[in-house]
Amino acid sequence: MSNMTPKNIVKELDSHIIGQHDAKKAVAIALRNRWRRMKLDDSLRHEVTPKNILMIGPTGVGKTEIARRLAKLAKAPFIKVEATKFTEVGYVGKEVDSIIRDLTDASVKMIRLQSIEKNRFRAEELAEERVLDVLIPSVKNDWGNSENKKEPSKTRQNFRKKLKTKELDDKEIEINLASTPIGVEIMAPPGMEEMTSQLQSMFKNLAGQKQKPRKIKIKEAMRLLIEEESAKLINLEEIKEKAVEAVEQNGIVFIDEIDKICKRGEISGPDVSREGVQRDLLPLVEGCTVSTKHGMVKTDHILFIASGAFQVANPSDLIPELQGRLPIRVELSALTIEDFEKILTEPSASLTKQYSALMATEGVIISFTQEGIKKIAEAACQVNDSTENIGARRLHTILERLMEEVSYNASEWNGKKINIDADYVSNHLDKLVSDEDLSRFIL
C-alpha cells in the first residue's frame, strides 16, 4: 500500500475508466489518507475519521465503477447498495443496519479465501497423501499397525510423481469425503435475514459432518480434498476477528441512487423510503456500533461513498445532517464522442477487445477500424441525445445490435475475417439511429 500514492491510484483507475479525473483524484486521496492514518500514534489515529464522498453525475459515467475498482485496488471489504431498497425502522423492508452486516459477511468471505490461499500448499500435500493412501494401502504388521509411515516406499514416490504430473487425473478411485448437510430453507419476512441465517447455521451444526464414500476421478477428488483440508487448516474464530477489523479499518460502502431518497419540497405526507431512511443512515455514517453474527462492528472509520444523478432533486434536498456527513462533493461530467471512442479502445478489457476475443473462440477474426469506432461512438452519442442519456451503457446496446448477425452465424463462419469499418456500422445502424421511435425501443 505504501507505493500506492494518489498519482499511482489515479493511473491504475485510468486503465479501466475513461475521464472523470476529479472523481478519481478524490477517491485516491481518501484511500491514501487511510494508509496515512494507520501510521499515526494510537491517540491521534482514533480521532482521524474518513472524509465521505458524494459523487454527482448522470447515469453511466463511471461512478459505480470507480468505487468498485478502488475496493479491488485496496483489497478492502466492499459493498454496493441501492438506497431505494431500504425503509425506515419499524416498516416492512430492509433496515440500513443490514448494510454493515452484509459488508461483514463479504469481509469474512474475503479473509477466508485469503487464508485458504495461504494454506493451499499444505492442503495440497495432505490431499495427495489421502489419495496415495487409497492408491497404495499401507501394509499392516502383526500388531495391526501401519508400517513404512516414516520412510515412503518407492512405489508411493512413483505414484506421487504421477499425481504431480497429472498422469492419473482420469483414473477413478473410491474415497471418503465429507457429505454436504441437507440445506434447510427458511422463509422469513424482510428484515429478519439475521434470524434465518442463525437458524440455518444451527440446523447445519446439528447435522454434523459425516464421511461418505464416493467413486470419482482423481482430478475431481484432488479438488474436493484440497477444499476439505483447507477448511480444516483455517481458524474460523481468527478469521472472524480479522474480518471485523478489516471492516472497521478499511471497509468501503457505496450507496447508489441516494438522490432517489431526497424529499423534495412539493411532496407532502408520510414517505417511508425517503427522509426516514436518510435519518437512519446518519448514525452509520457518523459512527455507531452494529451487532452482526460475527461480532460488534464499529462504523467510525468506514468510508462511505454516495452517488446519484440528481436530475430531479438537488444535493441540497438531502437533510442537512446528512449533507454535513458527506463533505467531499465531486461532479462527474457527461461523456462526449471522444470519451466513447476511448472507452471502446483504451481500457485493458474494452468492449471491442471482448467481442473480438469472444468471436475468436469460434474462429471468426474481428477487426475494428478507427473510422468504425468513431461511427459507433457517434451513434451512441446521438441515441443518448435523442432518447434517454444512459452514458457508456448505451455502447453495450449499440455493439450488441451491431454484432448480432456475426454472433448468430459465428459457428458457420469459421476462418472468416470481418472488418468493422464506417460502412459496416452505417449499414447496420443508420436506420435504427435516425428513426427516433426505433431507437427508443431497440437501442
Swiss-Prot record:
Subcellular location(s) of the protein: Cytoplasm
GO annotation terms (biological process): protein unfolding; proteolysis involved in protein catabolic process
CDD domains associated with the record: RecA-like_HslU
Entry keyword set: ATP-binding, Chaperone, Cytoplasm, Nucleotide-binding
Gene3D superfamilies reported in the protein's UniProt record: 1.10.8.60, DNA helicase RuvA subunit, C-terminal domain, P-loop containing nucleotide triphosphate hydrolases
Top-level taxon of origin: Bacteria
Binding, ATP: I18, G60, V61, G62, K63, T64, E65, D256, E321, R393
One GO molecular-function entry: proteasome-activating activity
GO cellular component: HslUV protease complex
Subunit structure: A double ring-shaped homohexamer of HslV is capped on each side by a ring-shaped HslU homohexamer. The assembly of the HslU/HslV complex is dependent on binding of ATP.
Entry similarity comment: Belongs to the ClpX chaperone family. HslU subfamily.
Reported function: ATPase subunit of a proteasome-like degradation complex; this subunit has chaperone activity. The binding of ATP and its subsequent hydrolysis by HslU are essential for unfolding of protein substrates subsequently hydrolyzed by HslV. HslU recognizes the N-terminal part of its protein substrates and unfolds these before they are guided to HslV for hydrolysis.
HAMAP family for the chain: HslU
Identification of the protein by name: ATP-dependent protease ATPase subunit HslU
Protein species of origin: Wigglesworthia glossinidia brevipalpis
Lineage of the organism: Bacteria, Pseudomonadati, Pseudomonadota, Gammaproteobacteria, Enterobacterales
